[in-house]
From Swiss-Prot:
GO terms for cellular component: cytoplasm. The keyword Cell division applies. Keywords: Cell cycle, Cell division, Chromosome partition, Cytoplasm. One of its GO terms (biological process) is chromosome segregation. It comes from Staphylococcus aureus (strain MRSA252). This is Segregation and condensation protein A. Belongs to the ScpA family. It is found in: Cytoplasm. The gene is scpA.
Amino acid sequence: MYEVKLDAFNGPLDLLLHLIQKFEIDIYDIPMQALTEQYMQYVHAMKQLEINIASEYLVLASELLMIKSKMLLPQSTSDIDVDDDPREDLVGRLIEYQNYKEYTAILNDMKEERDFYFTKRPTELSHLETDESWDPNHTIDLTELIVAYQRVKNRVELNTPKSVEIRKETFTIQQATEQVTSRLKDKDHFNFFSLFTFSEPIEQVVTHFLAILEMSKAGIINIEQQRNFEDINIVRGVNYHFG
């Protein structure tokens, strides 16, 4: 027995999204019977090939069967609630996962392009930390984080000389993750913009942003904001661990 990723799927949601795209299914109106059958065929194929199936694939299989059975149950008119669709939670998770994949692909392309450019070394500047009180329960969505990233990118580009095509050392996502983790060691939150000097290479900004996306997805950090247009805070998540 050995473990592989069938067609390089990164988990059950990745497989489910692949099936939705392959069969051109409307993600907002999923035909649960057809999709469940296709998903179960993949799971059975993995079993027949003696592939060690991760438990998360089986958990999602059970969830799909439960949703399918709920939708097949007869309902009287009085029982029907248009706001109580058993697919709602699954659709929300699929859309969120799809957004992460799309944004990560775009940022990876940008990082690969910028790896070919050399810019001047960062100048030491004071960080933008603030001591304002804040409520740790105001999370933000991915769109607001993209807007914040664009603000940093624009400011960095204003302070960056035009490119010369010379390879430079690569700043890795692992290094960016370690920087963020270290910043949270002694303080449970910090200002998102304080990560940047605004004179660093743009690829370093992109790498930091990719790291923040991955850490947020893994529950290592939360990304929070009091009100629209105010400062964004990076906060320890439930899975945060230093060292």
